[in-house]
């Protein structure tokens, strides 16, 4: 008899078929308490869980005594109670490598669109304001040869540094938990403390996961140390930034502009002051949102779950010691 797994996000037909070759698959709309209660017997028997954008906490795990592995269609896993999973010897699988290049593209797009005011001036054209040759009030700022500060030099940070160094001749500063020899050798990146990065960078790109240590890492103090001409980019996790402090910094002119793919609360409230600021490019968490990459992430998540439930945990596992 095939192991039972619960799928809480739709998959392309071919990936669903691959999953069904190995497991009895039960599809549910979400992991809300109501859904769990209505499908109590299914949850009680499930050995695997696959999906994204839902919280997996101790309360849910209590309803799933046979769960052995959960696979998320994402690189981030701050919506999972890792301690609770580990205590129950449940493997947590994620998709850390599939989306690297695509998210780096998104970061570079935010750098360019904020600096050159692409969204703002495009809207002015659509509004019929382009009635003569443009003047300085339409101008943006250069990206090439400007200093890029990267906070978090992981896979995505490296991919961004590659684009900035080779494509735009940008000097690169970075701050991370440790020195990154490859970044320094390939891109001439310079390691520095966070204060130095903030003070010297023309663009500050935040690429950090959400943890207890990174929550509200960026607040009024950090924005106050940035150049008034600096542009802030966040495509990591929204709560790493104190959004009220960011709004205040933009309103006071402490920083020049912001390009944001993530927010403290998502979806972003329609009455957020960020949406009324011409110098803010706000997009709906599109970091990995291309057809190709989202398919690749789903395929990776399916393979991860198959491997985990077959005892083949060699990569993409958040808590691999559980398998020991």
UniProtKB/Swiss-Prot annotation:
Gene Ontology molecular functions: glyoxylate reductase (NADPH) activity; hydroxypyruvate reductase (NADH) activity; hydroxypyruvate reductase (NADPH) activity; NAD binding
Domain of life where this protein originates: Bacteria
Assembly notes: Homodimer.
GO cellular component: cytosol; plasma membrane
The UniProt record lists the keyword NADP: yes
Cited HAMAP family: 2_Hacid_dh_C_GhrB (MF_01667)
Catalysis: reaction(s): glycolate + NADP(+) = glyoxylate + NADPH + H(+); (R)-glycerate + NAD(+) = 3-hydroxypyruvate + NADH + H(+); (R)-glycerate + NADP(+) = 3-hydroxypyruvate + NADPH + H(+)
Name assigned to this protein: Glyoxylate/hydroxypyruvate reductase B
């Amino acid at each position: 008899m095939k192991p039972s797994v619960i799928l809480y996000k739709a998959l392309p037909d071919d990936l669903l078929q691959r999953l069904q070759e190995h497991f009895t698959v039960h599809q549910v709309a979400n992991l809300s308490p109501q859904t769990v209660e209505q499908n109590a017997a299914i949850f009680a028997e499930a050995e695997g869980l696959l999906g994204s954008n839902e919280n997996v906490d101790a309360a849910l795990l209590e309803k799933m005594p046979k769960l052995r592995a959960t696979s998320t269609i994402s690189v981030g896993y701050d919506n999972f109670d890792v301690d609770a999973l580990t205590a129950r010897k449940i493997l947590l699988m994620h998709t850390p490598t599939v989306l690297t290049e695509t998210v780096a593209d998104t970061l570079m797009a935010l750098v360019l669109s904020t600096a050159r005011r692409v969204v703002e001036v495009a809207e002015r054209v659509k509004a019929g304001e382009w009635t003569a040759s443009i003047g300085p009030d339409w101008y943006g700022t250069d990206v090439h040869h400007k200093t890029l500060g990267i906070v978090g030099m992981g896979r995505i940070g490296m991919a961004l540094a590659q684009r900035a160094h080779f494509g735009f001749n940008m000097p690169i500063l970075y701050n991370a938990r440790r020195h990154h020899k490859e970044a320094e050798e390939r891109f001439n990146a310079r390691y520095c403390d966070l204060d130095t990065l903030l003070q010297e960078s023309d663009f500050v790109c935040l690429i950090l996961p959400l943890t207890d240590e990174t929550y509200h890492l960026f607040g009024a103090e950090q924005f106050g140390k940035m150049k008034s001409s600096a542009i802030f980019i966040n495509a990591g996790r929204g709560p790493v930034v104190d959004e009220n402090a960011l709004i205040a910094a933009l309103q006071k002119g402490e920083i020049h502009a912001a390009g944001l793919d993530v927010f403290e609360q998502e979806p972003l409230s329609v009455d957020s002051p960020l949406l009324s600021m011409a110098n803010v490019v706000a997009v709906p968490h599109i970091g990995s949102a291309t057809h190709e990459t989202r398919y690749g992430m789903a395929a990776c998540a399916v393979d991860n779950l198959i491997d985990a439930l077959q005892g083949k945990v060699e990569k993409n596992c958040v808590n691999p010691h559980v398998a020991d």
